[in-house]
Every structure is written in structure tokens, then in C-alpha cells.
């Protein structure tokens, strides 16, 4: 589970939750800690929007955050005619990044269940330096070059981590059929 807030609007926050299955998600909803949170939520949250995503790539290392840890949340609108080609370029790039770059701690890619051309990317880096190093890697530069014409819009949402907790060890999986 990851909790983030917008860097430019402290009143806007995001929760990123990954579950092994629908059953695991239902178990979470039935657990006492969630029920306690849900009971207090109306006093803390004035508006809530849930976006259900279809996972395409999940990969992470065990994260022990510190003051240098950074998060990126990016939304990319992919032109329908490039959906498959975009996916076939970006997912292997993410796997390579996670496997060979020490400072890349987590990478997730998913599409909106209601708009499959809207991609969400959530990334965690050990530091700003590690993120800048990632941006200079040949595989990342190739991804940018190869996909530049495939999107209609890219939105980078400025976020800061509030709470980062994972079990780590999700292998860099390109989700089949996702």
C-alpha cells in the first residue's frame, strides 16, 4: 500500500493498493483495520474517487523509504491504433529498468478499466539522482523515441510519498492478457 499527496495541493491525496486477487481485496475490506478506517473516513475525506485498473506490469523490490525516496505518477493517453505497439515497447522497458537499475524500487503499469487507452504509471525511485540516471539509460531513451507519436497526452502528477509499505519481491511481471 502506498499513500501519496500532491506536491502542489496538500489537500489532494492518492492511495495505491495492489492485491493478489479479488478474494484478497474482499478479505482486506472485511478486516478490522479497514473497517475502522472506513468508519473514520467521512471525517477525513471530503471526496473520494476510485479508479479500477487492469494491471499490465507489476514489479518491485522491498522498499525502506527515507527522505530521499521519490515517487512518480504519470497518466498517458495512448492513441487507439497504437495501443498494442505501445504496450509491447513500454512493458519490456519497465522490466529492464527494474532488473538492471539499483535505484529503481518499483514500477507498475495499468490501464483504466473504463478507458483502456488511459495508462497509469506509478514508479518509486531511491532518490532524485536515481531517477535522473534512469532517464539517461539507453532503454528509457529508446522508449521515449519509439513512443513519442503514440500518445495524445502525458500528464505527470507531482506527488510526494506519505506512507510506503510493501512486501517487496513482486517479480517484474508483464501481466499476461492484461
Describe these PLM feature segments:
Residues 2-29, 67-77, 108-136:
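Short, well-ordered beta-strand segments in beta-rich or mixed alpha/beta enzyme
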Residues 2-11, 36-70, 106-117, 142-178:
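Glycine-rich beta-strand-turn "strand-cap" elements at beta-sheet edges
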Residues 22-24, 36, 44, 94-97, ...:
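Short loop/beta submotifs within extracellular cysteine-rich repeat domains
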Residues 28-31, 40, 89, 134-137, ...:
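Residue-level signal for well-ordered alpha-helical positions
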Residues 33-37, 80-105, 139-143:
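Short amphipathic alpha-helical segments
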Residues 68-96, 128, 173-178:
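Amphipathic, soluble alpha/beta structural segments
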Amino acid at each position: 500500500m502506498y499513500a501519496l499527496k500532491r506536491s502542489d495541493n496538500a489537500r489532494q491525496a492518492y492511495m495505491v493498493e495492489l492485491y493478489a486477487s479479488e478474494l484478497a481485496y474482499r478479505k482486506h475490506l472485511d478486516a478490522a483495520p479497514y473497517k475502522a478506517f472506513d468508519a473514520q473516513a467521512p471525517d477525513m475525506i471530503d471526496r473520494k474517487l476510485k479508479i479500477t485498473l487492469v494491471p499490465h506490469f507489476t514489479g518491485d523490490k522491498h522498499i525502506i523509504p527515507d527522505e530521499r525516496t521519490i515517487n512518480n505518477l504519470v497518466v498517458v493517453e495512448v492513441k487507439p491504433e497504437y495501443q498494442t505497439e505501445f504496450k509491447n515497447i513500454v512493458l519490456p522497458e519497465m522490466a529492464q529498468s527494474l532488473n538492471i537499475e539499483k535505484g529503481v524500487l518499483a514500477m507498475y503499469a495499468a490501464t483504466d478499466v473504463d478507458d483502456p487507452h488511459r495508462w497509469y504509471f506509478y514508479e518509486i525511485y531511491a532518490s532524485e539522482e536515481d531517477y535522473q540516471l534512469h532517464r539517461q539509460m539507453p532503454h528509457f531513451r529508446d522508449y521515449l523515441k519509439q513512443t513519442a507519436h503514440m500518445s495524445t497526452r502525458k500528464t505527470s502528477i507531482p506527488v510526494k510519498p506519505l506512507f510506503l509499505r510493501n512486501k517487496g519481491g513482486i517479480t517484474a511481471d508483464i501481466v499476461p492478457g492484461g
